[in-house]
Amino acid sequence: MTRDEAKNKIIFALDVDNLKDIDCWAEKLSRKVGMFKVGKELFTSAGPAAVEAVKKHAGEVFLDLKYHDIPNTVAQAMLAAGRLGVKLANLHALGGPEMMEKASQAVRKEFSENERPRLLAVTILTSSTQDTLKAVGIEHPVEEMVVRLAKLAKESGMDGVVASPLEIEAIRAACGPDFLIVTPGVRPSFAAVDDQKRIMTPAEAVKAGADYLVIGRPIAKAADPIQAAELIVDEIVAGVQ
């Protein structure tokens, strides 16, 4: 794997709440990572301008808003995301097949295949444990639920899933080589675990079959964020040779 290929797998999580910080990070890292994640805090604070701020620096955007609502509402939200020009957008697989199908159909109807956003379904959050699932009435093991939701997502027209790195291999086996797998819960060897429960190193995740890695604090909190991003690229390249 080349350094450029490894770099393009990194999605930097913009865990900020204002446009000035977006400009700072996008300018600093646009050549060091493949994409920027705009999540709930940032989008609630800055709105669509957050996406435009990233694109101003030639950055691609993963709009991480995890839609979960009635099918028509989610379909309209995905159309709005597509009009913003984001590369990836997501919803919760637990919203069910009709919700996912409506979103997929709406996006494919309005946009060409090359221009449309790729739609991802969130399976089980990486902060969740077996106890978390039991508390909300889900008795199935985490991995079983993740694979079940991933298969449902594929059948419902999703392009891929967001899932813990520990479930990558099972998802790949169940859903095939062309199904996108985006994984948070990735921590390079030099970083702290923080609040993610089911984790791997970047190299381990890529080797297991991840297409994209969502990484925030290990880069943002580093003394030298640019160097941290480069070290992660080094780890990936060295680990998958």
From Swiss-Prot:
Keyword Cell membrane among record annotations: no
A matching Pfam family: OMPdecase
Family assignment from sequence similarity: Belongs to the OMP decarboxylase family. Type 1 subfamily.
Pathway the protein acts in: Pyrimidine metabolism; UMP biosynthesis via de novo pathway; UMP from orotate: step 2/2
InterPro entries: Aldolase_TIM, OMPdecase, OMPdecase_AS, OMPdecase_bac, OMPdeCOase_dom, RibuloseP-bd_barrel
EC number assigned by the record: 4.1.1.23
UniProt-listed PANTHER family: OROTIDINE 5'-PHOSPHATE DECARBOXYLASE
Reaction(s) catalysed (UniProt annotation): orotidine 5'-phosphate + H(+) = UMP + CO2
A Gene Ontology BP annotation from the UniProt entry: 'de novo' pyrimidine nucleobase biosynthetic process
Name the UniProt record assigns to this protein: Orotidine 5'-phosphate decarboxylase
Active site: 66
Annotated keywords: Decarboxylase, Lyase, Pyrimidine biosynthesis
Amino-acid positions noted as binding substrate in the UniProt annotation, renumbered to this chain: 15, 37, 64-73, 126, 187, 196, 216-217
GO molecular function: orotidine-5'-phosphate decarboxylase activity
Protein purpose: Catalyzes the decarboxylation of orotidine 5'-monophosphate (OMP) to uridine 5'-monophosphate (UMP).
A Gene Ontology cellular-component term: cytosol
Quaternary organization: Homodimer.
